[in-house]
Amino acid sequence: MFVDQVKIYVKGGDGGNGMVAYRREKYVPKGGPAGGDGGKGADVVFVVEEGLRTLMDFRYQRHFKADRGQHGMSKGQHGRKSEDLLVKVPPGTVVKDEKTGQILADLVTHGQTAVIAKGGRGGRGNSRFATATNPAPEIAENGEPGQERDVILELKVLADVGLVGFPSVGKSTLLSVVSSARPKIAEYHFTTIVPNLGVVETGDNRSFVMADLPGLIEGAHAGVGLGHQFLRHIERTRVIVHVIDMSGLEGRDPYEDYVTINNELKEYNLRLTERPQVVVANKMDMPDAEENLQAFKEKVGDEVKIFPISAVTRQGVRDLLFEVANLIETTPEFPIHEVADESDTSVMYKFDTEGVKFEITRESDGTFVISGYDIEKTFKMTDFSRDESVRRFARQMRGMGIDEALRARGAKDGDIVKILEYEFEFID
């Protein structure tokens, strides 16, 4: 089964917890803090594996959770960083954040990697909090939570040339003639329902990859006839070969077919019209084909170069392949997404903290609910089993302006304040 779009969940590993410990060697006067830091959580890393062709494996495993870092230890020993979780994907995979729609990665070459969910940093041990006024702190941090998100994987096949046209115009037959590919061929519409790839070699030893794409119909740009699934595979091609049935056996007008398909390409993605297009008049071995071709030429004018062929008899196929190979050599690749500067790639992993850093709402029972990335992360990294950590968290809340904001909302002594699933009393 050919699977070209899936939704999965990924989570980076949490950082290891820091430790509260002290030196106890008899030859070390007054000891001192010796709690080590936790190790960094593992990242979820996507890596391109050229042997894969579809996203089929993700239908059976949709959750990927990386390991957390090792906890800190006594004697100042830091926890070990966990090994990254490597997830193999086929070439041509585009990774998109489901919530924001942001393109996280466009993976095309074998061995290419991208960090999709970063692991959290390790929590600091008590040796990190020692000061002149507090030489033996009873405080350590929990590890930072790993990044988690739902992502959409889309596979857009890697091909130099894409065959487009209405169903049953002879695209699959043409691919089978010019390459070793063996797509399914039959006398009914939508015989081809998945892209088929074939390596084409010309008479002068040039080669390129050609994709036979499922037939398009009017409204494909809006998803009619699975149009979105079919059109996405055209985006990576450098040259579009537009195959038109000149026989007239389907009862359609070749010129109307030509206009309709080009409109679908334009409506789906305007940049598709920037690619050079080769118009192929197929089925020229049929009785009325020559007459239909002349009428077609009169309507499109001399600006459109047309290659009359018969995929069955191979008439005109050689000249067509030479023209396609020439266009590939002179046509640069078309980036399908805006690629961020390499120095800015870290931006994709950062939470946008501009503006409001927390939000206070009130439930029907009077409970104040505090939410926001910064406060929730700080809450998760606090070890509430230690009084000193609790006091530090209270200072952090004041530093963020939460206490003042609660008073402005009318909070009084004894009111219930909720962060995540935990409740505590507000003390003014």
Swiss-Prot record:
User: Which Gene3D superfamilies does the entry link to?
Assistant: GTP-binding protein OBG, C-terminal domain, GTP1/OBG domain, P-loop containing nucleotide triphosphate hydrolases
List, in alphabetical order, the GO biological process terms annotated in this UniProt record: ribosome biogenesis
Annotated binding of GTP, by residue: 165-172, 190-194, 212-215, 282-285, 310-312
Q: What is its main location?
A: cytoplasm
Which InterPro entries does the record associate with it?
Answer: G_OBG, GTP-bd, GTP-bd_Obg/CgtA, GTP-bd_prot_GTP1/OBG_C_sf, GTP1-OBG_CS, GTP1_OBG_dom, GTP1_OBG_dom_sf, OBG_GTPase
Which UniProt keywords are listed?
A: Cytoplasm, GTP-binding, Hydrolase, Magnesium, Metal-binding, Nucleotide-binding
Report the cofactors.
Mg(2+)
Q: Where is the OCT domain?
A: 350-428
In which residues is Mg(2+) bound? S172, T192
Q: Which PROSITE patterns match?
A: G_OBG (PS51710), GTP1_OBG (PS00905), OBG (PS51883), OCT (PS51881)
Give every Obg domain span: 1-158
Q: Which GO terms describe its cellular component?
A: cytoplasm
Q: Where is the OBG-type G domain?
A: 159-329
- Location of this chain's protein in the cell: Cytoplasm
Any one GO MF annotation of this record: GTPase activity
**What's its EC?**
3.6.5.-
Job of this protein: An essential GTPase which binds GTP, GDP and possibly (p)ppGpp with moderate affinity, with high nucleotide exchange rates and a fairly low GTP hydrolysis rate. Plays a role in control of the cell cycle, stress response, ribosome biogenesis and in those bacteria that undergo differentiation, in morphogenesis control.
Give the family from UniProt.
Belongs to the TRAFAC class OBG-HflX-like GTPase superfamily. OBG GTPase family.
Q: How does it assemble?
A: Monomer.
- Full protein name: GTPase Obg
